[in-house]
Swiss-Prot record:
UniProt EC number: 6.3.5.-
Gene name, Swiss-Prot/TrEMBL: gatB
Name of protein: Aspartyl/glutamyl-tRNA(Asn/Gln) amidotransferase subunit B
Record PROSITE patterns: GATB
Lineage: Bacteria, Fusobacteriati, Fusobacteriota, Fusobacteriia, Fusobacteriales
Family note: Belongs to the GatB/GatE family. GatB subfamily.
């Protein structure tokens, strides 16, 4: 009998909080855009006798994350030392929350491509500190302690995911939720979001989980999905061939698309956790939580409803425009300047997203400002240019930041709306295309629009795209009655 297998997946996500300063001291939390080892002090370097002091902003941001992820926030929690010896840990321990974290029992929900709704539990969120950044050369390694003690929250999911698609969508949803709170850049590219996957397999229907393997070195959401798929296959094959899965930590090898053994997995006892003696218990009052609730930014779900109601967008368009908070902000700025929500939505969903996809960039690196895109839309609104010419102006504006009105005048792209001039062109086309005229007159009501479109196209060709298409259309229909 062939056994069927089921995978069990849990994710641990580390997020850097953009508080401006580190978690235990006043050093700047900037480690990539400045010189090496500039933002350090005796506290974040772990000098003997240097005492940590908890940054209040870290707690506020951590509470925002917990609220956004539907967590229960504990009024009292504490800090613990996780002891281990590694070059990037200057104190030879990490301050974290092991015994009791500040938030627990949360969840997030999302829909898969199939339409199935999935709810993933969040075991807990804990406040901790980052390590120094190791930079590896050919024959040596360097340590940048600018990153040491940058504030982190670790979001630990329940082992509720059953395949790589669910894990991928969990990460996407988590990223969007946190981005809306503006507490973190949530970027794997810059390291402000890091993810480890815990993966095991069991016989389908079993209530006993298999041996868990942790996979690290995952540098994109797609890498997470690929590593999960590989590891599930590896574990099933190993068991079916009579072997057993060892509890271990493995690294994802992106080049070869496999996981490799890094070390045997440590148990909690290996880290000799004990309460942090240099910090008081973390006390969060209900009043503090309520104050932060009032300061919470609009959620994506609330924004979708507002976009539908205020801008008359359908569900699909509102969903796409709110997928990234920066894109939704860009859309609202374009609407503010153009006063035309429908055209703004259409241009962003087609032309802007086309460029973002082609260049593989996000809206923050898009070269046309919201004000300039709005000006292009207003030129269409005022019939100064046609939609076709607007696309030409758009392409020019990608590399030219000047006012679109200046570009239109300089390139001679102003739309022709002089009826007498357009009429001459219409007459010329009708005189030279008798077959199309006859075809239009003999066509049934279903074919007439297609034939008309062809005649309009001929007029637009003569005018080099400048003739007002509405006037062209009206004149042709009048003459072909």
């Amino acid at each position: 009998m062939i056994k069927e297998w089921e995978s069990v997946i849990g994710l641990e996500v580390h997020l850097q909080l953009k508080t401006g300063t580190k978690v235990w001291c006043g050093c700047k939390s900037d480690y990539d855009e400045s010189g090496i080892n500039l933002h350090t002090c005796p506290i974040c370097l772990g000098h003997p006798g240097a005492l940590p002091k908890l940054n209040k902003k870290v707690v506020d941001y951590a509470i925002k994350a917990a609220l956004a992820l539907n967590c229960q926030i504990n009024n009292e929690s504490g800090f613990d030392r996780k002891n281990y010896f590694y070059p990037d840990a200057p104190k030879n321990y990490q301050i974290t929350q092991f015994e009791k974290s500040y938030a627990e029992k949360g969840y997030l929900e999302f829909k898969l491509n199939s339409g199935r709704q999935v709810k993933i539990g969040i075991t807990k969120i804990q406040i901790e500190e980052d390590t120094a950044k190791a930079v590896h050369g050919k024959n040596e390694s360097y340590l940048n302690f600018n990153r040491a003690s940058i504030p982190l929250i670790e979001i630990i999911s329940e082992p509720d995911m059953r395949n790589s698609e669910e894990a991928y969508e969990y990460l996407n949803t988590l990223k969007n939720i946190i981005k809306y709170t503006k507490i973190s850049d949530v970027s794997m590219e810059t390291g402000s979001l890091r993810c480890d996957a815990n993966i095991s397999v069991m016989e389908k229907g079993s209530k006993v989980f298999g041996t868990r393997v942790e996979v690290k070195n995952l540098n994109s959401f797609k890498a997470v999905a690929r590593a999960i798929d590989y590891e599930i296959g590896r574990q099933i094959e190993l068991i079916q061939n009579g072997g057993k899965v060892d509890q271990e930590t493995r690294l994802w090898d992106e080049e070869n698309q496999i996981t490799r053994v890094m070390r045997s997995k440590e148990e909690a006892m290996d880290y000799r956790y004990f309460n942090e003696p240099d910090l008081l218990k973390l006390v969060i009052s209900d009043e503090e939580i309520e104050e932060i609730k009032k300061d919470m930014p609009e959620t994506r779900l609330a924004k979708i409803e507002r976009f539908k109601n205020n801008y008359s967008l359908d569900e699909k368009d509102a969903f796409i425009l709110t997928e990234e908070v920066e894109l939704s902000d860009y859309f609202e700025e374009v609407v503010k300047y153009s006063n035309n929500a429908k055209l703004s939505s259409n241009w962003i969903l087609t032309e802007v997203l086309r460029i973002l996809k082609h260049k593989n960039i996000d809206i923050e690196k898009f070269t046309i400002s919201s004000e300039n895109l709005a000006k292009i839309i207003k030129l269409i609104d005022k019939n100064t240019i046609s939609s076709k010419i607007a696309k030409e102006v758009f392409e020019i504006a990608l590399d030219d930041s000047r006012d679109p009105e200046i570009i239109v005048k300089e390139k001679g792209l102003v739309q022709l709306s002089d009826t007498s001039e357009i009429e001459k062109m219409v007459d010329e086309v009708l005189a030279n295309n008798q077959k199309m005229v006859d075809d239009y007159k003999s066509a049934d009501e279903g074919r007439k629009p297609r034939v008309l479109k062809g005649i309009v196209g001929q007029v637009m060709k003569i005018s080099k795209g400048k003739a007002n298409p509405e006037i062209v259309n009206d004149l042709i229909m009048e003459k072909l009655k």
